[in-house]
Amino acid sequence: MTLEFPDDLKYSDSHEYVRMDGEIATVGISAYAIDQLGDIVFIELPEVGDSIEKEEPFGTIESVKAVEDLKAPVTGTVIERNEDILDEHEKLSEDPYIEGWLLKVRVKDPDELNGDDIYSADDYRKLVEGE
């Protein structure tokens, strides 16, 4: 997989990404995180209507290498989850930014994306190249 980091996204240091469209955030996992995890075998996501809190776990992802918490890059209410990836884990590695998104969240405070713990594509690339 080519490690791409689209410029229209924001990234967290726990390797989740956010694509904003008005007050709706599409949340997923970066190509870097998926590459590090290897083959995904299980994903647990919150239900529609659940609240998620920035920097708090909202689900888990299990691979052949590890089990990791998914941490919320924003605070808000889940309005949609990508049911397809629960059964078709390969969508995460094939297309993490379009087909492999995890959640759509109605964001409580969009200014959360302006903090020091949220990165542009260029800054995120520098972060992961240093790991």
Curated annotation (Swiss-Prot):
Keywords: Lipoyl
Keyword Nucleotidyltransferase part of the UniProt annotation: no
Domain of life: Bacteria
Modified residues (N6-lipoyllysine): 65
InterPro entries recorded: 2-oxoA_DH_lipoyl-BS, Biotin_lipoyl, GCV_H, GCV_H/Fam206, GCV_H_sub, Single_hybrid_motif
Domain Lipoyl-binding: residue ranges: 24-106
Cofactor info, note text: Binds 1 lipoyl cofactor covalently.
Family of the protein in this entry: Belongs to the GcvH family.
Record HAMAP family: GcvH (MF_00272)
Physiological role: The glycine cleavage system catalyzes the degradation of glycine. The H protein shuttles the methylamine group of glycine from the P protein to the T protein.
Oligomeric and partner information: The glycine cleavage system is composed of four proteins: P, T, L and H.
Protein's recorded name: Glycine cleavage system H protein
Source organism (scientific name): Trichodesmium erythraeum (strain IMS101)
